Design a protein with these regions (language model features):
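Residues that recognize and position ribonucleotide moieties
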Residues: 82, 131, 158, 175-176
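Hydrophobic alpha-helical segments typical of transmembrane helices
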Residues: 76-77, 102, 133, 137, ...
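Short, hinge-like loop/turn segments at secondary-structure boundaries
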Residues: 81-82, 108, 134-138, 207-210
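Hydrophobic helical membrane-anchoring modules
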Residues: 1-6, 147, 171-239
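Structured catalytic core of nucleotide-sugar glycosyltransferases
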Residues: 1-129, 163, 167, 184-192, ...
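Short, flexible, basic/aromatic active-site loop/helix in glycosyltransferases
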Residues: 111-153, 158-166, 217-221
Length: 239
C-alpha cells in the first residue's frame, strides 16, 4: 500500500489518448527525482476517444477521476485539486507541451523562498503567431487590471501548497486566474521560466473567438471577486 503522498500531480485531459502513456512515463521520471511518496490524479473531462489507462508503480499511485460530461479545464482542474491528498499540488497539461522535469525546480523555489504558488513562464513558446500574440495581449490586460504580478497565467504548469489549492473557487474560467486568486486570498506567489514544447500528438482544444469572449467576461467577474474576496487567512487556533 502506498504511503500518504507528499506530492499530488493533477492532470486534466480531454481526448489525449495518444499522449497519456508517454505523459505518465515522464511524470514517473520526475517523481523519482523528488524521491517522496506521490500520486498522479488524471481527470478525464468527458473524453470521447478510447484511451488506455497506464499502470501505476511502487513509487506512485494513479487515481482516475471521471467527470460525468465534458465540463472544461477549470472543472477538471478544480475536482482534481479537491481530491488531492498531497501537501503540494503540481498542475500540468496532458498534451506533453509542459516538461514535468521543471516541477522539481519550481518546488525548490517554492520552499526556499517560502512561497505558496509558483507558476511557469513559457519564455520560448511553441505555438503559432496568433496564439502567442493573443496571449501577450491577454496577459497585459489582465495584469494591468488585476495586478497579479504574473507574466504568463495561461501556463498550466504550476506548483502550489495544498491549502491555497483547496481554497480555489469552482467556476468556469477559474484556471485562467489561479495566481490572482491565490494572491488576493493573502498568499505569496512567484514565477520562473519553464520549457514549452511542441505538441507531439492530438490537436489543441482551444477555440479562438469564443475563448476571447469568455475570457473577457471572466476577467470582469474576476475583477469584482478580487476586490470582494476575504483577504485574511487562518494562521493558527489558540486555546
Amino acid at each position: 500500500m502506498n504511503p500518504d503522498p507528499v506530492y499530488s500531480v493533477v492532470v486534466p485531459f480531454y481526448n489525449e489518448a495518444d499522449n497519456l502513456v508517454a505523459l505518465v512515463r515522464e511524470i514517473d521520471a520526475m517523481l523519482r527525482v523528488l524521491e517522496q511518496p506521490a500520486e498522479i490524479i488524471l481527470v478525464n473531462d468527458g473524453s470521447t476517444d478510447k484511451f488506455a489507462r497506464p499502470p501505476g508503480s511502487p513509487a506512485f499511485r494513479i487515481r482516475w477521476l471521471d467527470l460525468s460530461r465534458n465540463s472544461g479545464q477549470s472543472a477538471a482542474m478544480y475536482h482534481g485539486m479537491q481530491q488531492a491528498r498531497g501537501r503540494f499540488v503540481i498542475l500540468m497539461d496532458a498534451d506533453l507541451q509542459n516538461d514535468p522535469m521543471d516541477a522539481p525546480k519550481m518546488l525548490n523555489k517554492l520552499e526556499s523562498e517560502q512561497l505558496d504558488l509558483v507558476t511557469g513562464v513559457r519564455t520560448k513558446r511553441n505555438d503559432n503567431f496568433v496564439r502567442r500574440a493573443s496571449s501577450r495581449v491577454a496577459n497585459a490586460v489582465r495584469g494591468a487590471l488585476l495586478q497579479d504580478h504574473t507574466s504568463d497565467t495561461g501556463c498550466t504548469l504550476k506548483v502550489l501548497r495544498a491549502e491555497p489549492a483547496k481554497r480555489l473557487p469552482g467556476w468556469n474560467g477559474m484556471h485562467r486566474f489561479i495566481p490572482a486568486l491565490v494572491l488576493s486570498a493573502g498568499y505569496k506567489i512567484g514565477e520562473m521560466p519553464v520549457e514549452h514544447r511542441a505538441r507531439r500528438s492530438g490537436v489543441s482544444k482551444v477555440a479562438g473567438g469564443k475563448r476571447a469572449v469568455r475570457a473577457t467576461i471572466d476577467l470582469l467577474g474576476m475583477l469584482w471577486l478580487s476586490r470582494r474576496q476575504f483577504k485574511g487567512r487562518l494562521l493558527a487556533e489558540e486555546d
